[in-house]
Amino acid sequence: MNSTALEPTLEFARKLDQEDPLRHFRDEFYLPPNSIYMDGNSLGLLSKRAEKTLFTILQDWKLLGIDGWTKGTYPWFDLSEKIGAMLAPLVGASPEEVIATGSTTVNLHQLVSTFYQPEGKRTKILADELTFPSDIYALQSQLRIHGYDPSTHLIRVKSRDGRFLEEEDIIAAMSEDVALVVLPTVLYRSGQILDIQLLTDEAHKRGILIGFDACHSIGAIPHSFSEWGVDFAFWCNYKYMNGGPGCVAGLYVHRKHFGSAPGLAGWFGSKKDKQFDMEHTFTPSLTAGAYQIGTPHLLSLAPLIGSLEIFQEAGIERIRQKSLQLTNYFMYLIEQELSHFGFIIGNPKDDVRRGGHISLEHEEAARICKSLKENGVIPDFRAPNIIRLAPIALYTSYEEVWNVVQIMKKIMQEKQYKKFSNEREVVA
């Protein structure tokens, strides 16, 4: 979408909606009444299909009891593998390389406990200072388990400007004492996409394994994890994937690592034909299924089935195309209408580097977010000064983007935000 061809009018926004090939998917979702939802990068909305598959699993439990493990609409015993196969195209992997299991942080613990093998002088883990805090907590914990001090053994690449990371800085930090690299695919504040293939290649040239947190990219951008040679990745399924609060997460392990014993063993990581032999000798699956630990949380897994059906129909390439058009249009309107109110666009403007959300910086960000909510817009605040706005390709309209900017303009003109305190709420 060429910004020179854009117009700041409501009529133009409606024209874009009429031309949108994905517009019919909006009817698949329950939209909060009297609201414009801009927080799908924190929690995606419920679709009617996700609701249906949840009720289906409940009905099977109701009617079949324990036989639901092998009978019913979606037999539970291998459901994690089947959902993994549905997730695989979204991360560019084979079905065997992906499994739906655990939570983001549990899966990170599992993968680091498997692939962090300190030996000789290779004892350190490389991360970055802008990543999501839970990843840092997990890495620090894993280092302590191995007897290392995180203050000396967890390297965090610094940002030059507090917004973005430079690949050259990350590569320069891949020293001979680094055993493992764990980075985000997309930075959760600024929405910057890192060059995953370049970083993977450079890590492997130095004999270092590398994994990625894909929480802010899964369902928003295409990936080619297998082709790029990424060793492992992990993500949540409740943001762009619309799997619901607490939805079971996902992980990917490159097939070259199949046969490696998982660091955290549990009975659902067994080969399926051995699991109920009840032997005390663990026989791990020869796929990513080996990295499961306990019994799957089926009621938190069920909505993902319906959600993934929508992704299969829409296609991640078309989703990405519309997402870029939405955020490009958003930035255009912000520059047209809000340039005199002190906002700074803190996300990359380049399509290749921009994820699925807009990151607006303002010294009154927390107050403005509260005022937006009062005006029916649901944004997201990240300390100290960031307003995140995520127009979601499957259910956000161009007219809604136009309306959000008009509401923000009115808030700033009338200084409506001044009646609120400039601090975050319990859940930002």
From Swiss-Prot:
Its cofactor is pyridoxal 5'-phosphate. The modification N6-(pyridoxal phosphate)lysine is found at residue 239. Keywords: Hydrolase, Pyridine nucleotide biosynthesis, Pyridoxal phosphate. GO terms for molecular function: kynureninase activity; pyridoxal phosphate binding. GO terms for biological process: anthranilate metabolic process; L-kynurenine catabolic process; L-tryptophan catabolic process to kynurenine; NAD biosynthetic process; quinolinate biosynthetic process. One of its GO terms (cellular component) is cytoplasm. Pyridoxal 5'-phosphate binds at residues 104-105, 132-135, 213, 216, 238, 267, 295. It catalyses: L-kynurenine + H2O = anthranilate + L-alanine + H(+); 3-hydroxy-L-kynurenine + H2O = 3-hydroxyanthranilate + L-alanine + H(+). Its EC number is 3.7.1.3. Belongs to the kynureninase family. NCBIfam families: kynureninase. This is Kynureninase.
